[in-house]
Amino acid sequence: MVEQVETWKFIEDTERTNPPINLKSSFTHFLFVSLMDESDLYRRWMRLVENLEREGIIKSERVKRAFLQVPRYKFVSDRYKEYAHVDEPLPIPAGQTISAPHMVAIMLELAELEDGMNVLEVGAGSGWNAALIYELIKRKVYTIERASDLVEFARKNLERAGYKDKVHVIWGDGTKGFPPNAPYDRIIVTAGAPKVPQPLIEQLKVGGKLLIPVGSYHLWQELLEVIKLDEDNKIKIKNHGGVAFVPLIGDHGWRE
């Protein structure tokens, strides 16, 4: 049962599944990347974080600190590292993307994460968002991913970045949630669904919050904040405006 729907601001900058970046494949490109050391990459990353804060996208010191602790270049393949500071999605395996930094920041600010919260992420992707979540809750994060290639990609990235024992990557259908670790204070979904999956509502604590894009299969959804009001799964929905994510595939999402 839905109590009410509130419309919030429209998010103008949305996710794009095919980022318009001119990726060079020549020898000079690889030579350039190899000559860049981590300090160069981190300086670029710091400038992006400062820009997101200046634009009012990063609002809290906690989210800013997490972004500075977990730079995106640690979660992309070598050929994309020099683009990690660009505020656009980047390709990752299985035809998916790592989200644009502004979109990740928007969702983390809306999540209002606190130390000790129990959080499930649906759509592990590269592992970057899960690492950010860990820095905001300081408790093991559970993230579920249906694409086996991405499960391995996320696990390797997380291990290299020092999060092997801090994030548990599960291979499975995220639209079913992960009952063994429920109930959750927060569930964050990083793909677009046709509707809010009922199992995710059921696995929230009363007062818990679910963030999920809901709408069409490609290119247009609305970012919904779903708050569970009671044990009968009565919910309140806030609409945070237009976004565009890859489709959420599963029994309670889109069919392949």
Place the predicted regions along the sequence by residue:
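Short hydrophobic targeting helices and cationic amphipathic motifs
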Residues: 19, 23, 30-31
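Class I SAM-dependent transferase core
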Residues: 35-120, 128-132, 136, 150-161, ...
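Conserved nucleotide-cofactor-binding alpha/beta core module
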Residues: 112-236
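Substrate-binding/catalytic lobe of Class I Rossmann-like enzymes that use SAM or dcSAM, i.e.
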Residues: 222-256
